[in-house]
A protein has these predicted regions:
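Conserved alpha-helical scaffold flanking the Walker A/P-loop in AAA+ ATPase domains
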Residues: 25-28, 81-101, 130
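Walker B catalytic acidic pair
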Residues: 40, 103-104, 115
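Walker A/P-loop
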Residues: 30-67
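Canonical AAA+ ATPase core
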Residues: 82-87, 108, 112, 120-197, ...
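AAA+ P-loop NTPase domains with strong preference for DNA replication initiators
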Residues: 175, 182-263, 288
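Pre-Walker A (pre-P-loop) alpha-helix and adjacent loop at the N terminus of AAA/AAA+ ATPase modules
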Residues: 2-44
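P-loop (Walker A) phosphate-binding loop of NTP-binding proteins
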Residues: 41, 75, 143
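C-terminal engagement/docking regions of AAA+ P-loop ATPases
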Residues: 231-311
Length: 311
C-alpha cells in the first residue's frame, strides 16, 4: 500500500507543520507494532500528533491525563455490581481503545504506571481475575514533560524499555511557525482530517512490515551496535535484547516506508538513536563530560563497521 503510506505522510505534514522527520518515525513505530514516548515541553504538538494519527488511521482514540490522583483502575477498568442483573460486569478503562494518549505519564504514581505496563507488553489487562484483551491494533503514545518540571519524576528503566522509540517534537522553525499561524487563521486542519486507512488496513500494513527481509549481515550489524552500547565506558546500562528486537522491527518499518522489501544498514542507522537513547543509563563520567545519550550513540554508529549488503 505505498500510495496509502504517502497519503498518510502528506496528511500528517499538513496538520503538523515542519516535523516530517518526527511524524515519519512515529508512523514507523505504529507500523512496527510499537509504542511511542514523546519527550518535550507543553504546547509543541504532542497531543495533536496523537489525535491526527487516530483519525487518519481510523482508530478509536482515548486520552488519559496522568496526575497524582489517577489510580490503576482508571487505566485498566474495574468490575461493578449490577443490582438489576445480580451480576458483576466489567467497566472498561482508558486502555480499551486502538490509540491511547497517556498524557504526562511521569506525573503519576509508579503503581499506576505499572498498570499501563502490563497492557503495553501483553495487550491485555487482568481485573479481579478476569482477563480482557485490548482491541487490535493497539498503540500507546505517552507524553513526558522534561524531568525537573513541577511534579515530574523519572520513569523506571522497565517502563522506558517498553517504548519502541522516544522522540522530541521541538519547536517549529520560523517558516513552519508562520505557516501554522496562517493556517489556523482559517481553520484547524485536524478538524477536517479524514480516514486514510481503516483499522483492518493498519493490521495488514503491520503484517507486511513484519515480513520485510533482514539479511544475516544486517542482523550481525545490529548485534554489534547493541554490544557496543553495553561495552561503552560512558554507558552503565546499554541496549537490552528487547531493545535490540525493537531496533530490527523499526528498521523493517523504515525499509517499508522507502518501498523496499529488505533492510539495509542505512535503515538501522536512521532509527538507532530513536530506539536506543531512552534506554541508556549513562555513567557519571558522561555527565561530567556533558555528553548526551544521542551524542554517544552517534559515536557508536561511527565506530561500528557497516556491512556490505547486496541490494
Amino acid at each position: 500500500m505505498p500510495q496509502k503510506i504517502k497519503e498518510l505522510q502528506d496528511q500528517l505534514e499538513r496538520i503538523i507543520k515542519g516535523k516530517k522527520d518526527i511524524t515519519d518515525k512515529i508512523l514507523m513505530a505504529v507500523l512496527a507494532k510499537g509504542h511511542v514516548l514523546l519527550e518535550d515541553v507543553p504546547g509543541v504538538g504532542k497531543t495533536t500528533t496523537a489525535l491526527a494519527l487516530s483519525r487518519l488511521m481510523g482508530m478509536e482514540f482515548n486520552r488519559i491525563q496522568f496526575t497524582p490522583d489517577v489510580v490503576p483502575s482508571d487505566v485498566t477498568g474495574f468490575t461493578m455490581y449490577d443490582k438489576q442483573s445480580g451480576q458483576f460486569s466489567y467497566r472498561a478503562g482508558a486502555v480499551m481503545c486502538n490509540l491511547l494518549l497517556a498524557d504526562e505519564i511521569n506525573r503519576t504514581s509508579s503503581k499506576t504506571q505499572s498498570a499501563l505496563l502490563e497492557v503495553m507488553e501483553e495487550g491485555r489487562v487482568t481485573v479481579d481475575g478476569e482477563t480482557h484483551c485490548v482491541p487490535s491494533p493497539f498503540v500507546v503514545i505517552a507524553t513526558e514533560n522534561p524531568v525537573g518540571s513541577s511534579g515530574t519524576q523519572l520513569l523506571p528503566e522497565s517502563q522506558l524499555d517498553r517504548f519502541m522509540i522516544s522522540v522530541s517534537m521541538g519547536y517549529p522553525d520560523h517558516q513552519s511557525l508562520v505557516d501554522l499561524l496562517r493556517d489556523r487563521q482559517r481553520e484547524n486542519p485536524l478538524e477536517n482530517a479524514k480516514t486514510v486507512v481503516t483499522r483492518e488496513e493498519v493490521l495488514e500494513l503491520q503484517k507486511q512490515v513484519q515480513e520485510i527481509y533482514v539479511a544475516d549481515q544486517v542482523l550481525d550489524y545490529v548485534a554489534h551496535l547493541a554490544e557496543a552500547t553495553r561495552n561503552h565506558e560512558l554507558i552503565t546500562l546499554g541496549l537490552s535484547p528487547r531493545g535490540t528486537l525493537a531496533l530490527v522491527r523499526m528498521a523493517k518499518a523504515a525499509a517499508y516506508m522507502k518501498e523496499r522489501d529488505y533492510v539495509i544498514p542505512k535503515d538501522v542507522q536512521d532509527v538507532f538513536k530513536d530506539v536506543a537513547a531512552h534506554r541508556m543509563i549513562l555513567d557519571s563520567k558522561a555527565r561530567y563530560q556533558e555528553k548526551t545519550a544521542r551524542e554517544i550513540l552517534s559515536e557508536i554508529l561511527a565506530d561500528v563497521a557497516e556491512p556490505k549488503v547486496e541490494g
